[in-house]
Each structure stands twice: as C-alpha cells, then as structure tokens.
Amino acid sequence: MKGSIFTLFLFSVLLAISEVRSKESVRLCGLEYIRTVIYICASSRWRRHLEGIPQAQQAETGNSFQLPHKREFSEENPAQNLPKVDASGEDRLWGGQMPTEELWKSKKHSVMSRQDLQTLCCTDGCSMTDLSALC
C-alpha cells in the first residue's frame, strides 16, 4: 500500500516537473525557429532604439527612414570609388579591415554555436532566454 502511494506521488511530481519544463522551453524547428528569433531580436532592438530617443524626437521622426551614409562617392574622380588594395594585392574594406573571408574565420565559433542551438531547439526545446542570446 505504501509503495503504491509513493509511486503515485513520485509519478505526479515527475509529471509536474515535465509540465514546468515544457512551459520554460519550446521546441522550434525550421521556419518557426527563424521567425521566433527574428521576432525576439527585432522587438528588443526596437525597444532599445526607442529608449535612446527622447519622446519629442520620436513624435517628430514618425515613419521616416534614413539610410546611413557609409561612404561618399565622387563623380568627378571615379578612381576614388574603387576599393583600396594594399601592397600584397589584397582588398581592404573602408575601415582597413580584411574582406569577409577573414571575418568568417573569426566568427566560425559563434556560427557553430548558433547551429548547435538551432539543433537543440528542434530536438529538446529551448527557452526564450536562450533565443534572445542570439541577438
């Protein structure tokens, strides 16, 4: 009798724990995963952006959108518009940085961890905190 009551109690505790975990973590695969990450990252960016702007300026800007000016192009001297090449013959970006190949090598670890997180979210589930870490 005591064994069956203990087993029933243990089963109910395990069921409660699994329900709590399912609320904390969500299984997301494919497009659901991508949409959720975009939603989480975009909403946090908009919040941070709006927190940094005074309210009077928010009302003033409305729906206007301006592109940042990365580099001015010269119509008079088209040679200035070409990318810079150093003595070794390798392209350099505007800020003196190496092309995307070097950037990919440096970001390889973070890309792998993002792929691991995507796999984990699909198989076991992940929390919204885990997903917001990608932003």
Curated annotation (Swiss-Prot):
Major localization listed first in the record, in broad terms: secreted
Protein's UniProt keywords contain Plastid: no
Disulfide feature: 29-122, 41-135, 121-126
Gene Ontology CC terms, in alphabetical order: extracellular region
Record's signal peptide: 1-22
Subcellular location: Secreted
Xref: InterPro entries: Insulin-like, Insulin-like_neuro_ligands, Insulin-like_sf, Insulin_CS
UniProt keywords, alphabetically: Cleavage on pair of basic residues, Disulfide bond, Hormone, Secreted, Signal
Propeptide: 49-114
GO terms for biological process, alphabetical: positive regulation of feeding behavior
An annotated Gene Ontology molecular function: hormone activity
Residues spanning the membrane: none
Family, as annotated: Belongs to the insulin family.
Subunit annotation: Heterodimer of a B chain and an A chain linked by two disulfide bonds.
Its job: May have a role in gut contractility or in thymic development and regulation. Activates RXFP4 with high potency and appears to be the endogenous ligand for this receptor.
Record-given protein name: Insulin-like peptide INSL5
